Amino acid sequence: MMTNLFSVFDPSAIFNFSLNWLSTFLGLLMIPSIYWLMPSRYNIMWNSILLTLHKEFKTLLGPSGHNGSTFIFISLFSLILFNNFMGLFPYIFTSTSHLTLTLSLALPLWLCFMLYGWINHTQHMFAHLVPQGTPAILMPFMVCIETISNIIRPGTLAVRLTANMIAGHLLLTLLGNTGPSMSYILVTFLLMAQIALLVLESAVAMIQSYVFAVLSTLYSSEVN
C-alpha cells in the first residue's frame, strides 16, 4: 500500500539517470513512419483530424492571421494529445501531469503573444483593457480586472491540463489499491469500473488537448 497517492507521479531514476522526460519524445519514433510506410486508415483518419483542426483554427484567427500560423497550434495539440495518451499506459511517466511541462508550453506562448501585441498593436491592446460600453466610473476597475485576467492566463492553461490529468490517475490509483481487499465478485465490478474510467480518461485526454490548443489560438487572435 502506498503511503502517498501522489507518489505515482514521482519521477524515478535508473542508475542515477533520470529518463522520465524521454517519454515526451517517444512520438518522434512513431510519427515519422507515416512518411515512408503506405498510409493506413489510421494515418488517413489522423490527417483528416489535423485538416479539420487547421480549418477551425484558421476561422478562429480570422482574416488577420498570418499564413501558416495554425501549424504551431496543431503541433501543440498533437504533442499534448500524445503525452496524455502515453500517460494512460502502465509504467510510462505522465509528463502532462507536471506543471514543469504544461507551464513550459503555456508561458512562452502567452509571453510571445503579449510582446507581439504590445509592440505592434499598442492601441489595440489598450482598447482590450476597457470593454465597449463601460461607464467612466468603472473604467479603472475594469482595467485592473482585465489586466489580472490576462496575467493569469498561462497559469490557468497549465493548471487546467495538469489537474485533469492528476484527477483521473488518482481515481484509478484509489480503485486499484482497494482490489487486494475485495472478494472475487467485487473485483469483477472493480475491473469494469476501471475500464469505464479509462474510457473517460481517454476522452479527457482528447478534450483537454483540444481545449489547450483552442484557448491558445483565441489568445493569439486577440493580439492581431
From Swiss-Prot:
GO molecular function, one term: proton transmembrane transporter activity
Location within or outside the cell: Mitochondrion inner membrane
Tree of life domain: Eukaryota
GO cellular component terms listed in the entry, alphabetical order: mitochondrial inner membrane; mitochondrion; proton-transporting ATP synthase complex
Membrane topology qualifier: Multi-pass membrane protein
Keywords annotated in UniProt: ATP synthesis, CF(0), Hydrogen ion transport, Ion transport, Membrane, Mitochondrion, Mitochondrion inner membrane, Transmembrane, Transmembrane helix, Transport
CDD domains: ATP-synt_Fo_a_6 (cd00310)
Subunit structure: F-type ATPases have 2 components, CF(1) - the catalytic core - and CF(0) - the membrane proton channel. CF(1) has five subunits: alpha(3), beta(3), gamma(1), delta(1), epsilon(1). CF(0) has three main subunits: a, b and c.
Protein family per UniProt: Belongs to the ATPase A chain family.
Role according to the record: Mitochondrial membrane ATP synthase (F(1)F(0) ATP synthase or Complex V) produces ATP from ADP in the presence of a proton gradient across the membrane which is generated by electron transport complexes of the respiratory chain. F-type ATPases consist of two structural domains, F(1) - containing the extramembraneous catalytic core and F(0) - containing the membrane proton channel, linked together by a central stalk and a peripheral stalk. During catalysis, ATP synthesis in the catalytic domain of F(1) is coupled via a rotary mechanism of the central stalk subunits to proton translocation.
Name of protein: ATP synthase subunit a
Organism for this UniProt entry: Drosophila melanogaster
